[in-house]
Amino acid sequence: PPNTTSFLDYVYSLRNQSLWDYLEIDDGGDWLLPSLLSGNLAICNDGSYMPKLSKTACSGAFILHCKATGKEIKGCFCDDSPNGDNYRGELLSGLGPLLLLKAAFSTSAATGIDQATVQLYSQSLHCDNKGVISHGNEPTTTLRSEQPQADLIRLLKSYTRKLPCNITWIHVKGHSDDHTPFEELSLPQQLNIRCDELAKIKHIDEKPGVGQAYTIKGIYRVDDGAEGLAARIREI
């Protein structure tokens, strides 16, 4: 039968819908793929870690913005893990856009697109963390032993490899509005600041329970801490 999957159909079919508790999608999201293919899609992400609030919780926010229409998808993933830190929040923020791009390429609108043509497209993702950028731009390299946050880095690399288009991570300076008015900043800088604010707001709102952890391959939620999370990641 023909593929009749819409963007929302795919997102709502993913397991562990609690992961998507904060996700705002303008006009159903079916504009995402045309925006990418026309070169009008801007993507940015940023993480948050507040050890004074919790030493284990972190969050990662992301915005996908169409420059032609102004339509957006905004989201935030929250995680509570013994491995929680700022880097984990940054990695979480990078996984959201990759999952949503996968959703866009899984819709009926993508069925008739020549895959060889799609492979010629390159989508930029802007991030202020150089570790995320380095791993995101090297999706086929293996990780060194004892690599911090290896579980999420493996997911970042895996999701990148499986996308039909090319992904390029680009550095954007964080907190650019410290010395420059917001309205004078570039679009990636503005999106980065908005992601930073969103990640902090949802981090404070969420306050995840101690012992909960999330893995986003599938998607599954586990409640047995870092060891259970690592075991499931190794099964990927």
How does the language model describe each region?
Residues 11-12, 17-116, 136-137, 189, ...:
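RNase H-like nuclease fold core
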Residues 158, 197-200:
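Ordered, helix-dominated protein-protein interaction surfaces in large eukaryotic regulatory proteins
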Residues 9-12, 24, 51, 64-67, ...:
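Intrinsically disordered, low-complexity regions enriched in small/polar residues
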Residues 1-38, 201, 205-236:
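Charged boundary/loop elements
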Residues 77-81, 160-164, 204-209:
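Low-complexity, flexible helical/coil segments
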Residues 49-52, 94-193, 211-215, 219-227:
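RNase H catalytic domain
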